[in-house]
Amino acid sequence: MSGLWKNEQGWQSGNTLETLTNFVSLLDSPLKYVIHETFMNTDMFTGGDCFDDYQWWLLAWLQAYSVEPNLRYLYRAVDIHDFVTVNAWNDSICGGGVQLCRNNTYKNAITNELFLLSNMRLHPYASLLGRAPTYFLDWALKEWQWFEASGLINGDSLINDGLSSSNQASSKSHEGNMGRSRDGTCVNNNGTTWTYNQGVILTGLALLANATRNVTLLNFAQKIADATIQRLIYSDRILKEPCEPNCNDDQKLFKGIFVRHLAYLIPYLTDAAHIQQYVSFIQQNAETVLTSRRCEIDGLYSVIWSNQSFNSCDSSRNTSSTSAAWDLFIAAAKTKPQSIMSSSNWTWLGLGNCMDDNGAYMPNFNKINVTETVCRTTAEQDQGAVAYDHQLGCPGYQYCRIRTLSDPQHGPPGWSYENNTARNVTRTNKLPVTSCYLRVV
């Protein structure tokens, strides 16, 4: 075992490890062993040659530590952080910020966003790691003060790829000038507004706002999130990467990273309208991808999430595009409880089919091709309904089961009846893409 996922670059495997860790935490999955095996087969320099590469793994190990508190994961993360801090922060070009690689002084957005987020993710562990209480927080504040003044955030509240400077050894793009940095030598290069640049910053700002009690930082995050879901989309409000349909393997991961961090942002918000807007966006994208963008030949997902592209088996699909889709599904599952109407008499029990403590199922009325709204409304009208579960499957496939104590003769018209032994619902079988809702008595 190499510690890397098949057909992925090194940094991508670090990103996918965070995706897997989120999946494990969601379902208490036995795949937890993969985290340990990955750790044993990698080191702090796994992933690539640049400082952004290392930090994807840093974040993955911190997420792994939150699921399984193995101190070796935490120590690996802080070792990466210390290496990046010593070698990447550079005041001589653009007045600060971390550069892309040891031999490339380009100041790009993602490397600096990752540095902000890494420090905020490490901040709660400062004492455990033998650092001063504000050590990581101070670095995060220093990074954000530089980032905000750098000109990376353009007039549309979107973040471009990086900065241009005549003093830089090299850079990835020099596409124009917009927004001058505070030292007067660097400007926004007007590079592509990749979706992941709009995503990682959201969690960094949310954590920084929470630590400093500065709500202005949340306002920044909301402006970036709003601009993304308004501008980087197809006409059907489905997220769009600027490179589509001709994205390379790096770029195929970007949308998954955005929605993951949009989901991370939501718990820190207090504005109900924004919460509902973001939850709705995630849910709509997830339903579209799950029902129309999976290739039935190999189970892989297309890089294009909009169903305006009719070929789900196009040549763009691979491990990277599928990893992004799983980020979307996990984000949808984590935000699902907040999407239920506050007036509802139902509470989300978890992912999977509804069952009792013995693993038995209740009798149910069931029907195929039923939306969740119809499923819930029909269950509401059944006085004997105890719970319902709704499943999304292959293209066009949605399935509703109303777990009920009602007489089979009193079922809704057009629905089938299945008899089973259980008489209550207490848990789920944790099946992905299915959600169980329990009636609130």
Predicted regions and their residues:
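Extracellular disulfide-rich cysteine clusters
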Residues: 341-441
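Acidic/His metal-coordination segments adjacent to aromatic residues that form catalytic metal sites
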Residues: 39-44, 98-101, 165-188, 233-245
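Inter-helical turn/loop segments and adjacent helix faces that build the functional surface
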Residues: 68, 122-135, 208-212
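Active-site cradle of extracellular carbohydrate-active enzymes
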Residues: 112-119, 133-208, 228
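CBM-like carbohydrate-recognition segments
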Residues: 1-52, 56, 64-67, 73, ...
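Asp-box/WD-like beta-propeller blade repeats and closely related beta-sheet repeat scaffolds
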Residues: 78-108
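Residue-level signature of alpha-solenoid helical repeat scaffolds
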Residues: 18, 59, 79, 117, ...
